[in-house]
């Protein structure tokens, strides 16, 4: 799962490779990204044979996201018990997607 952090407290997420599916526009909190993290983790667990196959989350912050946005998403990693995550640079294609949706 990749999570894109944008300006105006906006975020988008997608599963799999970039460009293969349209990102889902979401928000912070229990009915937003938290629900998506929990639901996607269950789906990954159900579709992979071994119980130790955990969902991996890639966090990508756009230039207009804030430190508070990053802290909030890291809090969500802890709350939802996501054990494997990384903060990596955002790609130009992902920046374009954020811009298209008004978050960059």
State where each predicted segment sits:
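Long, low-hydrophobicity, acidic/polar, solvent-exposed interaction domains
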Residues: 1-104
């Amino acid at each position: 799962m990749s999570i894109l952090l944008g300006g105006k407290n906006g975020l988008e997420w997608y599963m799999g490779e970039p460009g293969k599916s349209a990102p889902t526009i979401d928000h912070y909190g229990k009915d937003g990204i938290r629900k998506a993290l929990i639901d996607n983790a269950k789906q990954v667990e159900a579709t992979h044979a071994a119980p130790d196959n955990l969902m991996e989350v890639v966090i990508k912050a756009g230039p207009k996201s804030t430190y508070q946005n990053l802290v909030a998403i890291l809090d969500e990693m802890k709350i939802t018990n996501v054990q494997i995550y990384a903060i990596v640079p955002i790609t130009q294609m992902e920046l374009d997607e954020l811009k298209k949706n008004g978050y960059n």
